[in-house]
Structures are given as structure tokens and as C-alpha cells.
A protein has these predicted regions:
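Protein maturation boundaries and topogenic segments
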Residues: 177-192
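Cytosolic-facing regulatory segments adjacent to core modules
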Residues: 14, 18-105, 119, 634-637
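Helical hairpin unit composed of two closely spaced alpha helices linked by a short loop
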Residues: 106-151
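Internal intein/HINT superfamily modules and their associated LAGLIDADG
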Residues: 210-591
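The conserved Walker
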Residues: 4
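C-terminal regions of RecA-like/P-loop NTPase motor modules
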Residues: 90-106, 135-144, 158-175, 592-650
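Short, well-ordered loop/turn sites that connect or cap secondary structure elements
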Residues: 177, 194-201, 262, 574
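Conserved lysine of the Walker
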Residues: 8
Length: 650
């Protein structure tokens, strides 16, 4: 594999010359780039050592003709087959290779080159289609017991780096993400950063969208570094953000689209709900309530009393009861200067160096000594089943959230505030577990920590929150009033809508069924992005699978509001088996595709990028992957004017 013009086809023909001319074993090249006459001319140039330009122009000397005559008989008798059929499919290659195996005892297959092959089938992205070609070629090699050389083109990664030497990551068509990007696990329900996966070597189950736009668990089979590249921060209307390279694909209604081709206003997929994790583990309810209260309104700094600041007596009572699990006592400070209760140490006196049970418990969860802007939700909460997630959110909201009815605008206001962006993201992730999509807003603060608010918009999601989560304490009265108001007609922002382009597909199906717009009782609906209910009603009439998946799937179509370059960074990516996508930072992203090849050779010519390079005339064969042996770099001489590479030792 190499960038264009480096000598990929020449190397493939060198393999064939060695196989068929020198060792008299049958080989075949399926060429989608060059015609049969071009290939023959290159073979003659390499064997007779005649300049290819002279052969093409006819400016051959007598010595050239003599050398050509000496080699012609051996070349013509070689069991070398050329197929330059246009638009070759994998099925045609397999059929022709099988016949040659039976007829001529085929020993080598060369395909030039992979990205020009077509399948005739519809794939979600070109990357997946090329990956399928690679997999089928490997199966062909296994079936015929013949080595298959698949020539492939690298992406533009080498051109964008100071060091132009190619890497294995350049062979993958997908983009890359920063080390801090957090992947949503399906086994534990928590998120894990790419950098952590690289350090640990763990390959977890992750949540992924299938072809029906439903969340399914799939294994992440590979995680790898992709070098240093320019990174862009993409921000959505919901406040979700992700940092990725320009080549990383995002899911639009039309299909997977690289970030570089996205623009403000485009709609891309994010999960609207997430199932329970595969490996759920219940927590004691007293621990869950204490944890929610300490995260929401608690203080647990080193060398200071562990405190909780309640907003009302009902919340204080909840903490007093739940604190018993850690052998602690929630005692009110009644002296004049005090205004909050304290969780005292254990009743017995502890030896020096020993911490209180509640401090040890918080330390085990990674929360002890965390300040407000550093707080997050521990993994144990994400592992809990959905009913306990709702209980945790109920007490967390009572400590740091708000639920009220706004009579002026006729809308409910449901939000949670914090100075920790990580905590806000964690709460948004937990809300997806109970089927609620939330929105994040940022409030900068001069001279202090910025704050964020997590909003729940829309009557449908607000009612779901009030019924399945709710709040504890004084806020419960306001919640009941809000629920009563939401039972009547209310303003609905209709943020949960499908991309407007879905109507083009609906209209095509209407035409095919000879139906008119009025038969859907909504003749003006084409002018706006439809709410999810409209495609649902349309799907019932036109019986279209894509509309059915859109109306019932787990994808929320969020809007791109900002794309900003943030400079070069070290980036990473992974491979998900089967569905080839995962959820990162609350957004559905495509993955990089695992290479099926047993051996990957990257071709590097220093003088291809710099004509004055001191290594002019040299080329490196970088053995970047070898399943059954070590990797190595071999330096050779390139004689591209003779259409060949030569051993440096000769």
C-alpha cells in the first residue's frame, strides 16, 4: 500500500515476474487501473531493462531491440495471466481464480487495486464496502490455498505529517479521535477514554447502532494510535461535543459523512436512549442515596469535615437515614454560626492514619478530595439497573436540580446545574438509560469556575422524567403541579424531529403507490422538519422500511452548530465488529476498519515528496504487519524508469 505515484503497481508486477518468469509458476493480475497493453509494456521494460518512456515513444536503440528479443521467448512462455476487465466484482474474481487454479495450478493472485472494485450492493459507507472486499479476498486465499496480493491506496495521512513515512493507520479509511474521547461501554454502562483503553489493552463490549438504527452490544476488537493529526471540535445544538479529525465519519440521514464535509445546520445521529448494561450489579439503596446526595450537595475534602448542605428538612432526613450504611451519623450543628449538618467520623476513636468509614467508602468510589468542579458519577452507578438509576437521579436532582412550572410562558422548567462538565455529561448519559434526551448549556464565569446546566425540554420528556424519576423533598410539590399542567395543551418546542430530507423519500414512496399528499391529511408538512410522530404515521400508510426504522429507531437527529480547528493532537481509533460504529461523547461515530491481511507492506519513497532528498533512488518496504513473524523495514533501489525495484546488494 502507498500513496498514488509511489510504485504500487510496479511492486505487484515484480511479484508476478518473480513467480511466473523466474520460477515458472502461474500467476494472475486482475487490473482495474491499467489495460493489458500497459501491463505487458511494463513487464517487457522491466525484464529487458529498457526505459518505459522509450518503449512508449518508439525511440528504442538497436541494443534495446536486442535485449528485448533475448527476453521475449521467456516472457511469452511464462504462465502469467492478465485480466483487465472493467468493473470487476468479487464474484467474478473468485470464479476466474477458481478456473485458473484447476487449469494452470495457480500460485499467485494480484488485485490492482482494492479501492476501484465495485460490489453492486448498497453499503452504509465506502469504508465498509472496501473492508468487505478485503475480507472476501482473504477467504479466497484460504479456499484456493494461494497468496493474494491486494494493492491498496493509503489515505492522505503521510502528506499531512512532517515525517512522510506511512503508518498502518494510513491504510484505514476512517478518521481518528483524541485520547480523551469517551466510549460508551455495553458491559458496564460506563464510559471509558480511548487513552485508557490503549494503556490497559482492554477490548470491551460497546453500544452501537445496527442497520435498523437500534442500539445493540458489539465487541470493540481493536484500539490503535493513528499518529498526530489536525483535530476539529464539533459541537451540537444539544451541547454535546467531540474532537475528531476531518476524515472521521458521522451518521447523517443520507449515510456516513466525513467531518470535513459536514457544515453548520447538518443533522447527525446521537443515541436517544441506551439499554441496560449487560452486566448489571445492584447497589444498596442507602449507599445509592448517600452517593447522590454527596455528589449533589456534599463536601468531602481532605482534613475537613464531610458535610452535606440540604435544601429542606425532607432531604436532611433522607441523608440521616442513608448515612447509617457507613457507620456514620448525620448530626446537625446547632450552634449559631453553623447552618449545615455534618457527617461525623465513626463513633469509636480511630488510630492515627485511619480514615472514617464514609471517607474510605468515598475514596473507593474515587470521590474523596474531589471539589465541585471535579465531581463525576462513579462506575458503580452506571452498572446499576434502570430502576436504581432512576432512584439515583431522583435524589441527585433534589440536591442540585430544579423542577418548576413557568406560568408566563406556559412551559415546564427542568434542569440540573453543576460546575463540573464531566458530571453534567454523566447525568446526561444516565438520563438516556430512562429514555430521556437532554440539552447542555454553558454559563462562563469570570474569576471562577464555569457552570453548566442540563435541561430537559419538551412536554413528552418532561412528563417521562416526572413519572419515572421525579424529585424528593420540597421540589416534589412543584413537580406534581407541573405534571398537572402538562396534562393539558402546552407549548412544545418539537426539538425531536427528523431531517427534512426524509420527506423526499416519503414522496417517492407516495408516487410509487399512486397516493397524494392529502391522503396523509397533512398537505403542508413538506415545508418543515417532521416530528417523529409524522414519519410514524406516514410509515403506516406507505410501508417503507427506512421510514419505519427512522420513526422507531434509537437515533436522535441533533444539529451541528459549530466546527472549530483546535490544532494538531495525538489521535486514536478503534474497530467494532459487525456494525462498525460506536457511541463517543454521546454521539454516534463510525470506526476504523480492521485490516484482514496477514501481511501489510507499506511502500515509502523519500524522493516522492522531496526531489532533493539525500536518499534519492531508494525505497523502503515497511513490513508493518505480519501475523506469523516479525516486522521489518527493507531498503531497495527503485528503478521506476525501468518499471522495477532492485535489490540494493546487487
Amino acid at each position: 500500500a502507498a500513496r498514488p505515484g509511489v510504485g504500487k503497481s510496479t511492486l505487484g508486477l515484480d511479484f508476478m515476474r518473480s513467480c511466473s518468469i523466474r520460477h515458472r509458476m502461474a500467476s494472475v493480475i486482475f487490473s482495474l487501473e491499467m489495460s493489458k497493453s500497459e501491463i505487458v509494456m511494463r513487464l517487457l521494460s522491466a525484464e529487458a531493462k529498457i526505459k518505459l518512456s522509450d518503449m512508449r515513444s518508439g525511440r528504442m536503440s538497436d541494443d534495446d531491440w536486442t535485449r528485448l528479443a533475448r527476453r521475449m521467448s521467456e516472457i511469452s512462455e511464462a504462465p502469467l495471466f492478465i485480466d483487465d476487465s472493467p468493473n470487476l466484482t468479487m464474484m467474478e474474481i473468485r470464479a476466474k481464480a477458481r478456473r485458473l487454479r484447476q487449469k494452470a495450478n495457480l500460485k499467485l493472485i494480484v488485485v490492482d487495486y482494492l479501492q476501484l472494485m465495485t460490489s453492486g450492493k448498497k453499503y452504509e459507507s465506502r469504508q465498509v464496502e472496501v473492508s468487505e472486499f478485503s475480507r472476501h479476498l482473504k477467504l479466497l486465499a484460504k479456499e484456493l490455498e494461494v497468496p493474494v496480493v491486494a494493492i491498496s491506496q493509503l489515505n492522505r495521512g503521510p502528506e499531512q505529517r512532517t515525517d512522510k513515512k506511512p503508518m498502518l493507520a494510513d491504510l484505514r479509511e476512517s478518521g481518528c479521535l483524541t485520547a480523551s474521547t469517551r466510549i460508551l461501554r455495553a458491559d458496564t454502562g460506563a464510559e471509558v477514554a480511548f487513552g485508557e483503553l490503549m494503556r490497559s489493552g482492554e477490548r470491551p463490549m460497546v453500544w452501537s447502532l445496527d442497520e435498523r438504527l437500534r442500539m445493540v452490544a458489539r465487541p470493540m476488537i481493536n484500539v490503535f494510535p493513528s499518529g498526530r493529526k489536525e483535530v476539529f471540535r464539533l459541537r451540537l445544538a444539544s451541547g454535546r461535543e467531540v474532537e475528531a479529525t476531518g476524515s472521521h465519519p458521522f451518521m447523517k440521514f443520507e449515510g456516513w459523512t466525513p467531518l470535513a464535509q459536514l457544515k453548520v445546520g447538518d443533522r447527525i445521529a446521537a443515541p436517544r436512549r441506551v439499554p441496560e448494561p449487560i452486566d448489571t450489579q445492584r447497589m444498596p439503596e442507602s449507599e445509592l442515596i448517600s452517593l447522590a446526595r454527596m455528589i449533589g450537595d456534599g463536601s468531602c475534602l481532605k482534613n475537613q469535615p464531610i458535610r452535606y448542605e440540604p435544601v429542606d428538612e425532607a432531604n436532611l432526613a433522607a441523608v440521616t437515614v442513608s448515612a447509617a450504611h457507613s457507620d456514620g451519623a448525620a448530626i446537625r450543628d446547632d450552634y449559631l454560626a453553623a447552618r449545615v449538618p455534618s457527617l461525623r467520623p465513626a463513633r469509636q476513636r480511630l488510630p492515627r492514619g485511619r480514615c472514617t468509614p464514609i471517607a474510605a467508602w468515598l475514596a473507593g468510589l474515587g470521590l474523596f478530595t474531589k471539589r465541585s468542579h471535579e465531581k463525576c458519577v462513579p462506575e458503580a452507578v452506571f452498572r446499576a439497573p434502570n430502576d436504581q438509576v432512576a432512584l439515583f437521579l431522583r435524589h441527585l436532582w433534589s440536591a442540585g436540580g430544579s423542577v418548576r412550572w413557568d406560568p408566563t410562558n406556559g412551559q415546564g422548567r427542568v434542569y440540573y446545574g453543576s460546575t463540573s462538565r464531566r458530571l453534567i455529561d454523566d447525568v446526561a448519559q444516565l438520563l438516556l438509560r430512562v429514555g430521556i434526551f437532554s440539552w447542555i448549556t454553558h454559563a462562563p464565569k469570570l474569576g471562577g469556575h464555569d457552570s453548566w446546566r442540563l435541561h430537559i425540554h419538551g412536554a413528552k420528556d418532561q412528563v417521562r422524567f416526572l413519572r419515572h424519576v421525579g424529585v424528593h423533598g420540597a421540589e416534589a410539590v412543584a413537580a406534581q403541579e407541573m405534571l398537572r399542567q402538562l396534562k393539558g395543551p402546552v407549548r412544545n418546542p418539537n426539538l425531536d424531529s427528523a431531517p427534512k430530507k426524509v420527506w423526499a423519500q416519503v414522496r417517492n414512496r407516495l408516487s410509487a403507490k399512486q397516493m397524494m399528499d392529502i391522503q396523509l391529511h397533512e398537505p403542508t408538512m413538506w415545508k418543515h422538519s417532521p416530528s417523529r410522530s409524522r414519519p410514524h404515521r406516514a410509515e403506516a400508510r406507505i410501508e417503507d422500511r427506512a421510514i419505519h426504522e427512522l420513526a422507531r429507531g434509537d437515533a436522535y437527529w441533533d444539529t451541528v452548530v459549530e466546527i472549530t480547528s483546535i490544532g494538531d493532537q495525538h489521535v486514536f481509533d478503534g474497530t467494532v465488529s459487525g456494525t462498525h460504529n460506536f457511541v463517543a461523547n454521546g454521539i454516534s461515530l463510525h470506526n476504523s476498519l480492521e485490516q484482514d491481511a496477514d501481511v501489510v507492506i507499506l511502500l515509502h519513497r523519500p524522493d516522492a515528496f522531496d526531489r532533493d532528498d539525500p536518499r534519492g533512488g531508494e525505497a523502503d518496504f515497511i513490513l508493518a504487519k505480519h501475523r506469523n513473524g516479525p516486522t521489518k523495514t527493507v531498503t531497495v533501489a527503485h528503478q521506476l524508469h525501468l518499471s522495477r525495484f532492485a535489490n540494493m546488494a546487487r
